[in-house]
Regions:
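Short aromatic-cysteine micro-motif
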Residues: 248-251, 282-444, 448, 454-519
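N-terminal assembly/attachment segments of tailed bacteriophage virion structural proteins
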Residues: 1-150
Length: 646
């Protein structure tokens, strides 16, 4: 086990510290370095200007201010495999240095430590990186004024400091690499577990029972928690607290997600077989980087926690106070998008309109985006080691009755029920959402009603009467009964965070993944942060800059062009700079091969919508992308969800 003697400030480091104490400069940490140099007992290491035998250089992951204002704790992951370097020859780690920028001298060795007990860093074996997670205590003049270079980018301390709670969480657990891999050319949806995920059993539940899921006790899943979030982003309660509420009365129902490192990369083995890898961890090891769900803005501000919506968004009308020249204070009604159980999802709005409904909630509220979509995809693949979510979690709410002929009313009346063919009407379920209109998918007569009863007709042979709530409706023989969006909250009785409820049929049963209901199915979800122009996707990692039909500035061009034909996803493109981005470049798979979900594309497509709806069936799933609609598209099966950040 690697153990260190007390670290020392070098002579140059002391001089820089004196300048900082005199207010002439601040301490800017640039990098860390390991080496294999030998030191004799009592050797004066303070005079060193470099390590004796430097071997590897690493960025500083983040820093924490200790109880002493003049000390910071630097976090460094020493590994034999990073995005920029692969260690080909192993060595004994015997020396360690921290470098800083001196305004007169340039980069200097600021602090040095020698090992009392060395540790061997092996060469990378081509499968699993070795990592030593290190905390280095460093003397500075004022910890608040220290900046660090992280992965080559300068960031303010306020953006990169890890709160003590997170440090405690990570350091009490072994840094793990939970990973999977698949042969790129193999059509199977199954992946092979690697790293610390080997041997884990992960199952999804059906109904309200519990099942074995080993990964839920490992970071980051062990630290994900449903919560009630106020509009100022204060957590009012966590699931299990006496005050926690699913219905939104104590705040939006959100999933608190801790800062997580993810990776997606490709390697070819000695036999010439190309593999795709996915992995997650609490630390920056191997090919992993801080997932871009947690970064924001041109300076890559870091959010220690992100809050993802558990339910499709529903609209709440609230009273807001405002001030004008004529009236000092007045009340104004505004609409906001809420994540809560027991409501019909909002729909028939454009992506831009959903964006406004989210931003109206306050600072750091946004429309849920492509970064959350990609992050959850990786979490699913790592947890269940496959890309067939419908086969694992269930079909989702994707197979509801929709028929413009069988759904025609067989009797005219004004009331709260419609008479339809028995074989069609009996496919509906009590409590499900329906609409009635002059034709299939028309809501001209009744929108988003709930079925209250289904019984045989006493007046029409081979027919049933489907009763619904709300005001009476004038039914004619041109009226059509069909399944529209479904109310939220179907999964709140489940004990397991992953799986499906026991509905009338599997295809009418809501699924949840990490407590997130209707992750696919029920209603398509707009995903902000990605604008499309003639199959070229432009991404944005600055949420304040999200806008429709923008292709420059904060939006950057993804390093490949999307596929031009629709079909089941066979291949996602790969941009090494933004490795988590998954855009279909090749179809030709099926509902049970490769990625198992359907991709829609058209030359005029401008926005991204994910998941599927009540009528999309086997093509639905987390990897299904609807990229064929304009920014002005709005329809009954397009919805959105609010996302929040610390």
């Amino acid at each position: 086990m690697l153990m260190w003697n007390p670290s020392k400030l070098t002579t140059a480091g002391k001089a820089l510290l004196a300048k900082a104490q005199a207010g002439q400069t601040s301490i800017q940490i640039t990098k860390a370095q390991t080496g294999s140099g030998s030191y004799s007992s009592g050797e004066n290491i303070e005079s060193r200007t470099a390590l004796k035998t430097p071997k590897q250089t690493f960025p500083i992951q983040n820093k924490v201010i200790s109880d002493a204002d003049s000390t910071v704790i630097l976090k460094i992951a020493i590994t034999n495999k990073s995005e920029s370097e692969t260690l080909s020859t192993g060595y004994d780690i015997t020396e360690f240095g921290i470098f800083a920028q001196d305004p007169q001298k340039g980069e200097i060795l600021y602090s040095i430590a020698t090992a009392s007990t060395s540790d061997y860093m092996p060469a990378y074996n081509g499968v699993l990186p070795s990592v030593i997670n290190m905390s280095y205590y460093l003397e500075v003049s004022n910890a608040e004024n220290v900046t660090i270079n992280s992965a080559g980018a300068l960031a303010l301390q306020a953006d990169l400091e890890a709160l003590e709670a997170r440090v405690t969480t990570i350091e009490k657990n072994k840094v793990e690499l939970l990973g999977v891999r698949r042969k790129v050319d193999a059509s199977s949806y199954a992946w092979e577990r690697i790293g610390d995920a080997v041997g884990m059993v992960c199952k999804a539940a059906v109904g309200n029972g519990t099942v074995q899921n080993d990964m839920m006790s490992h970071y980051p899943f062990s630290e994900m928690r449903p919560c009630n979030l106020a509009e100022d982003r204060t957590v009012n309660a966590y699931l299990g607290d006496a005050t926690f509420q699913w219905d939104g009365t104590n705040g939006d129902v959100m999933l608190e997600v801790p800062m997580t490192y993810t990776g997606r990369w490709f390697e070819t083995d000695a036999d010439g077989v190309k593999w795709e890898y996915r992995a997650i961890s609490s630390a920056q090891i191997g090919h992993l980087h801080l997932d871009h769900l947690f970064t924001d803005g041109a300076d890559r501000r870091i959010s220690e926690k992100v809050y993802l919506p558990i339910f499709p968004g529903s609209i709440e009308h609230i009273e807001s106070s405002t001030q004008s020249e004529e009236v000092s204070v007045r009340s104004v009604a505004v609409d906001v998008l809420r994540s809560r159980a027991g409501y019909m999802p909002a729909h028939n709005k454009t992506c831009g309109q959903f964006r406004i409904l989210c931003k109206t909630k306050g600072d750091n509220w946004y429309l849920d985006d492509v970064w959350a979509m990609h992050f959850l995809d990786t979490c699913y693949i790592v947890m269940f080691a496959n890309t067939h979510a419908q086969g694992t979690l269930g079909p989702g709410r994707t197979e509801f009755p929709e028929d413009g002929t069988k759904g025609l009313a067989l009797q005219e009346r004004t009331g709260n029920y419609i008479t339809v063919a028995k074989d069609y009407g009996n496919r509906f379920a009590i409590g499900q959402g329906i609409s009635i209109g002059n034709g299939l998918w028309s809501q001209s007569l009744a929108a988003d009603r709930l079925v209250t009863k289904i019984e045989d007709s006493t007046e029409v042979e081979n027919a049933v009467c489907v009763y619904f709530d709300g005001d009476p409706v004038a039914i004619t023989t041109t009226s059509v009964l069909w399944s529209s969006v479904q109310p939220t909250g179907a999964t709140i009785g489940m004990a397991s965070p992953n799986g499906r409820v026991e509905g009338k049929t599997p295809g009418m049963s809501a699924i949840r993944f990490l407590w997130i209901e209707d992750w696919y199915g029920n209603i398509w979800q707009f995903r902000d942060g990605d604008n499309i122009q003639k199959y070229q996707h432009y991404y944005c990692n600055d949420r304040s800059a999200y806008a429709d039909k923008v292709y420059n500035g904060s939006y950057f061009k993804v390093g490949y062009v999307a596929g031009t034909a629709e079909g089941y996803v066979k291949t996602f493109g790969y941009d090494p700079e933004w490795s988590e981005i998954e855009i279909c470049t090749e179809n030709g798979a099926s509902s049970n091969t490769y990625f198992c979900d359907y991709y829609y594309a058209a030359e005029g497509g401008e926005v991204v919508i994910s998941g599927g709806s009540v009528l999309r069936g086997a093509g639905s799933g987390p990897f299904s992308r609807h990229c064929s609609n304009s920014a002005g598209a709005s329809i009954w099966y397009f919805g959105g969800r609010p996302q929040a950040r610390k």
